[in-house]
């Protein structure tokens, strides 16, 4: 038994470290925005378009990826995803044309979402019985952030030691992708039985899910929580453009912003949620706290002497948002969704919740290009206050919905 547990945690470590690297390329501009834009010679709008193409395709990939995961070995899918993403990284390292970068973004959507995301969820689920699922998924989130922090810190060290050579960073990440892909093939089990899967209606439960107001509300709670996190990923270029922070310092702050606070936020969010016995109530508090912090953050004048204040406020917002990210799928359990429809429900709320990637970056990129950078960034971060207010209202509505749903389930059980 102890040996099986050790093997389980080793496999979780491999899966988690794969998860910590898989999204670094698509979101690399979160950390190296200025360097990436300079090497590619892109405008803010073009940088936003790269993200928007990736995000738009992801909406389809999240929804349809489960079909692939049910028909192929998770080990093969995870290995394929990591290795192919790494290979395209070497292409990215040549700093190709705008059209080529759009093509690369399309490939990344396929390899990081369509063939990867459902396979990872399935692989983690198969590592243990129901009594360890919470720990498996909780530690996966924390190990993801830890691995990303390790890899990103190493990348920043390479960036600094090589005279801020961004190409070396891309090559380093490309190698890591391929290596972890190989480790995944070696250490992860081949899930047998795909060949004997029963034929099922792929759209079973879709009607039930789409007609549920709770599902739509949960989806939009995730939407606004995720949108805050996505835009806070622009903290680094905001600090360099408005507060004149140095490139190396910006890279360090970017790594902490993107990965460092994730360890603390996600774990704390899970623990507090369990203590409160309601993820929805916890999320409501988080939206309220983020709204207050954002008001202060936007009000900080853009002068270099207040750089540290801006950094502290920005990272504080990110900390709360990562706590939100760690638990914003938990309301699906509180909604008492029938187990046979849970996969469909998760797919639908993912499409709604991650929709900001499809358009926010392009919208805000155009806003910043059309205004002064200071004004553009203020508008961008200021809009998040409204997002948090809407999130607060939606979670309040959800709490009432859940009370009604719990009463209905209790009444049905009593009959």
What are these model-derived regions, one by one?
Residues 1-5, 191-218:
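Juxtamembrane intracellular "pre-TM" segments in multi-pass secondary transporters
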Residues 29-31, 213-266, 325, 360-361:
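Extracytoplasmic gate region of multi-pass secondary transporters
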Residues 71-82, 274-288:
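Cytoplasmic membrane-interface "Motif A"-like loop-to-helix N-cap segments
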Residues 61-73, 265-278, 368-369:
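Helix-to-loop junctions at the C-terminal end of transmembrane segments
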Residues 134-156, 350-361:
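Glycine-rich segments within core transmembrane alpha-helices of 12-TM secondary carriers
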Residues 334-372:
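A late C-terminal transmembrane helix in Major Facilitator Superfamily
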Residues 279-328:
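C-terminal transmembrane helical hairpin of 12-TM major facilitator-type secondary transporters
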Residues 105-143:
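Cytoplasmic helix-loop-helix junction between adjacent transmembrane helices
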């Amino acid at each position: 038994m102890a040996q099986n547990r050790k093997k389980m945690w080793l496999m979780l470590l491999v899966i988690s470290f794969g998860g910590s690297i898989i999204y670094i390329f698509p979101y690399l501009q979160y950390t190296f925005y200025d360097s990436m834009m300079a090497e590619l010679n892109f405008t803010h709008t073009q940088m936003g378009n790269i993200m928007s193409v990736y995000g738009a395709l992801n909406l389809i990939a999240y929804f349809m990826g489960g079909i692939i995961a049910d028909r192929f070995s998770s080990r093969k899918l995870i290995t394929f995803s990591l290795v192919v993403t790494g290979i395209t990284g070497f292409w990215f390292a040549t700093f190709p044309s705008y059209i080529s970068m759009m093509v690369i973004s399309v490939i990344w959507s396929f390899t990081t979402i369509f063939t990867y995301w459902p396979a990872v969820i399935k692989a983690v689920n198969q590592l243990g019985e129901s009594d360890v699922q919470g720990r498996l998924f909780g530690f996966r989130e924390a190990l993801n952030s830890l691995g990303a922090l390790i890899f990103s810190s190493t990348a920043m060290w390479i960036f600094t030691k090589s005279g801020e050579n961004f190409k070396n960073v891309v090559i380093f990440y490309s190698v890591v992708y391929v290596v972890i892909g190989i480790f995944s093939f070696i250490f992860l089990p081949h899930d047998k039985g795909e060949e004997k899967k029963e034929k099922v209606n792929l759209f079973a439960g879709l009607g039930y899910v789409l007609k549920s107001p709770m599902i739509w509300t949960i989806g939009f709670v995730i939407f606004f929580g995720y949108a805050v996190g996505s835009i806070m990923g622009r903290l680094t270029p905001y600090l360099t453009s408005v507060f004149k922070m140095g490139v190396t310092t910006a890279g360090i702050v970017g790594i902490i912003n993107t990965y460092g606070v994730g360890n603390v936020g996600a774990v704390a969010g899970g623990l507090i949620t369990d203590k409160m016995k309601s993820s929805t109530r916890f999320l409501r508090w988080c939206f309220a706290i983020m709204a207050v912090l954002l008001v202060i953050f936007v009000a900080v004048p853009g002068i270099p002497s207040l750089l540290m204040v801006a950094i502290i406020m920005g990272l504080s917002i990110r900390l709360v948002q990562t706590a939100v990210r760690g638990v914003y799928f938990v309301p699906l359990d509180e909604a008492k969704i029938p187990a046979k429809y849970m996969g469909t429900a998760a797919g639908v709320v993912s499409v709604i919740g991650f929709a900001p990637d499809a358009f926010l970056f392009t919208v805000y990129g155009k806003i910043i290009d059309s205004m002064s950078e200071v004004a553009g960034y203020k508008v961008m971060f200021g809009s998040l206050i409204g997002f948090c207010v809407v999130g607060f209202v939606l979670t309040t509505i959800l709490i009432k919905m859940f009370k009604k749903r719990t009463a209905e389930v209790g009444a049905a059980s009593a009959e």
